């Protein structure tokens, strides 16, 4: 069961650039909820509440319960506009989700036990995480807050591909249906000397030009 987080919102009466500017001056974020069979609804949120929430990973990858005076709608964050240099959120888009319809979402990858793996124990090995998140398709109830990748058995020279990730029940990676060339590397454990040699070769090629 996907974990949800509740966020209290209010309906927004005034719209337009002037109204949005006044809301921001008052510490309120203009936002919109769309999708499903319902009409889009303009809402507003407390900036301080959202500023704290957006510092957490779950804000971007979990089902959110928008509570409008007791009317709760389940949504996903789809877009968040930030001020270019101020600590200010300008606008947020939320998309409604239906319990019976699959959704597409980006889910963070959490890598565990790297330090105790054969590759992690070697001072001569460089372990790189090529991806930090993955796009998945699933029903809302199956959406994971994150996907854990156990690296405890990672060997020197090993490569973990997208197809090797253990997924929770009901979760799919649509990228894998597009062909073998989309089965990209997620983790690479490369011997440090190999990397140093590659750098040296590139430098030599540059000098020769």
UniProtKB/Swiss-Prot annotation:
Domain of life assignment: Bacteria
GO cellular component: cytosolic large ribosomal subunit
Family designation: Belongs to the bacterial ribosomal protein bL25 family. CTC subfamily.
GO BP: any one term: translation
Protein name: Large ribosomal subunit protein bL25
One of the Pfam families matching this protein, by short name: Ribosomal_TL5_C
Provenance organism: Xanthomonas campestris pv. campestris (strain ATCC 33913 / DSM 3586 / NCPPB 528 / LMG 568 / P 25)
Coiled coil: none
Record-level Gene Ontology MF annotations: 5S rRNA binding; structural constituent of ribosome
Keyword Lipoprotein on entry: no
The protein's role, per its UniProt record: This is one of the proteins that binds to the 5S RNA in the ribosome where it forms part of the central protuberance.
Keywords assigned by UniProt, alphabetized: Ribonucleoprotein, Ribosomal protein, RNA-binding, rRNA-binding
InterPro entries given in the database record: Rbsml_bL25/Gln-tRNA_synth_N (IPR020056), Ribosomal_bL25/Gln-tRNA_synth (IPR011035), Ribosomal_bL25_b-dom (IPR020057), Ribosomal_bL25_C (IPR037121), Ribosomal_bL25_long (IPR001021), Ribosomal_bL25_short (IPR020055), Ribosomal_L25_dom (IPR029751), Ribosomal_uL5_bac-type (IPR020930)
Assembly and oligomerization: Part of the 50S ribosomal subunit; part of the 5S rRNA/L5/L18/L25 subcomplex. Contacts the 5S rRNA. Binds to the 5S rRNA independently of L5 and L18.
């Amino acid at each position: 069961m996907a974990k949800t987080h509740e966020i209290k919102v209010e309906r927004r009466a005034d719209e337009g650039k002037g109204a949005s500017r006044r809301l921001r001056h008052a510490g309120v974020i203009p936002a919109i909820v769309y999708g499903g069979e319902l009409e889009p609804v303009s809402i507003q949120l407390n900036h301080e509440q959202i500023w704290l929430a957006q510092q957490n990973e779950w804000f971007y990858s979990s089902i959110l319960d928008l509570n409008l005076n007791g009317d709760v709608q389940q949504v996903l964050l789809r877009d968040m506009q930030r001020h270019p240099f101020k600590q200010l959120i300008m606008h947020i888009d939320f998309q409604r989700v239906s319990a019976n319809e699959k959704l597409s979402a980006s889910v963070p990858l959490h890598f565990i036990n790297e330090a105790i793996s054969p590759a992690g124990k070697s001072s001569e090995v460089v372990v790189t995480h090529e991806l930090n998140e993955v796009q998945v398709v699933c029903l809302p109830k199956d959406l994971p807050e994150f996907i854990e990748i156990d690296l405890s058995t990672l060997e020197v020279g090993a490569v973990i591909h997208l197809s090797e990730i253990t997924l929770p029940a009901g979760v799919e990676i649509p990228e894998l249906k597009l062909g073998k060339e989309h089965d990209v590397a997620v983790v690479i454990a490369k011997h440090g000397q190999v990397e140093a040699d590659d750098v040296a070769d590139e430098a030599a090629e540059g000098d020769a030009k």
